[in-house]
Amino acid sequence: MIELEKIPHIHEISNHGPYHGAREKNTATFQARSTRQNKLVPSLEEAIRRTGLKDGMTISFHHHFRNGDHIINTVVDKLAEMGYKNLTLAASSLAAVHAPLIRHIQNGVITHIETSGMRGELAEQVSRGLIDCPVVFRSHGGRASAIRSGDLHIDVAFLGAPSCDPYGNANGYSRDDEDGIACGSLGYARTDATYADNVIVITNHLVAYPNAPWAIPEFEVDYVVMTDDIGDPKGIMSGATRYTKDPKELLIAKTAANVIEAAGYLYDGFSMQMGSGGASLATARFLRQKMIDQNIHCRFALGGITGQIAAMHEEGLIDRILDVQSFDLDAAKSLKNNHFHHQISASYYASHMVAAAVDQLDFVILSLSLIHISEPTRH
């Protein structure tokens, strides 16, 4: 028997002594544990109650289903039914499909909104004074930084996932169901999952453990809820992610590609990001032809990823894809099937608090609804 008291400086060592933290061996089989000892909760209402959500707290959502999302409306409807008030809604973005939130703002269920974008009737009503408190808009990278720093504290994150196992390993697609719903990358959800006090994964497709590969690991998930409907993947490719045939937008795209080339940024091993919007997405088509003509390739493409970028990767024109959001179903399929199509978090993508992938870009093509160009100041 070792006499601990005789060991020199023993009292300067914290938590010294025999280890008493060992748990009794669980002799149940894997199948039995998966059935009985998991994170599955019988209903959304029960999961909400278990989180301890209270009036005045902050709830978050991702927008990877874009205009096909059904999670936000379903959850806020339930919260209203349960009597919650004065909640802050912190979604990574809000689309036209979220117009039903208007009545929940009018009824005091939602009193604050923090997001990165807002469209449709909800945006129109907010612009006309629907909500008393100013809406906080952040860039996607700014939102990730605010969550990481604690400026945006999330009490409960409600994260829709096209596949999840009983322990919470969740992903934006399923390898067990070729025909199932898919949204591709869960990049914006990953930051919420990491820093939220409570995380509820809502899925329509429960798979056996382990759901590998996963976007969100089980140790970041508190509860898993099964539902019949999380969203319509056809809504992913809508509005800002459309393919354009507009002659004006095509002219803008062609000109942008020419400017990139003339500026010296189209070289062998360059890096790029293509944003949403018809002209922005069309620019990739013109760049592709220039790359083929000049026999050059792109080292990596970043950001919201389209099937067009995925096709260029499969052609060998792009070495790596860093995907924070899949803009269409072809991109989601590529993420599932292509080894060098990587899923990244919003923090990895563009947080100013850490070294981010945007810092390595040669150029970015983005589309804006409105640009104000002022006259230069004359002295």
Model regions and ranges:
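Conserved alpha/beta enzyme-core scaffold
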Residues: 1-374, 378
